[in-house]
Amino acid sequence: EPNPRLETVIRGVELCRAHNIDLILAVGGGSSIDCAKVVAGSVHYDGNPWDIVLDSSLVKDALPLGVILTLSATGSEMDPMAVITNTEANLKYGVGHPDFIPKFSILDPTFTYSVPVSQTAAGTADMMSHTFESYFTLNDGAFLINRLAEGILQTCIHYGPIAVKEPENYEARAN
């Protein structure tokens, strides 16, 4: 589901507990991965997972998380952040914890071939927007980081349209 919901996190926690799960494998894009991160951090917490979204210091013993990426966009496969929506409270918050960093991520460009054109374009725009956030954050003296961001943006501008026109172009999907 887009914008992973607290209700889905709660169902995931219940499933993990009921079946004594010891590793979570998230398959999909950023929303699936974000949901899995908060599930992993909530399984050994007795309260509501929303508490962890509000205060990540409550994560004490997260389950390990692996990722198979099928939609490139957010970078969630390599970072400690997650965004969860609480529909009851009409809130959408981000949370970060070192234990949310996946233990492994499988990024096979062929797994993205079936992504619809509209989502490929939106994913490219999402990558660019996240890169712009970093680029325009006040980081005096961050010369190297800014050059990396510029390289990412140039790559998106070059390969994004190719991936849209040729969904099974390995080079475009890999870059």
Positions of the model-derived regions?
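N-terminal small/polar loop signature for handling phosphorylated ligands or for N-terminal nucleophile
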Residues: E1-G47, S57, I162-R173
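Conserved acidic residues
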Residues: D22-I24, L63, K103
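Short acidic, glycine/serine/threonine-rich loops at helix termini
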Residues: A36-V39, S76-A82, V117-S118
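Short, acidic/small-residue loops that bind anionic groups at enzyme active sites
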Residues: D46-T70, D99
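A gly/ser-rich beta-alpha-beta helix-loop segment of oxidoreductase catalytic cores
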Residues: L65-V67, L71-N90
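Carboxylate- and glycine-rich phosphate/diphosphate-binding segment that chelates Mg2+/Mn2+
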Residues: M81-A174
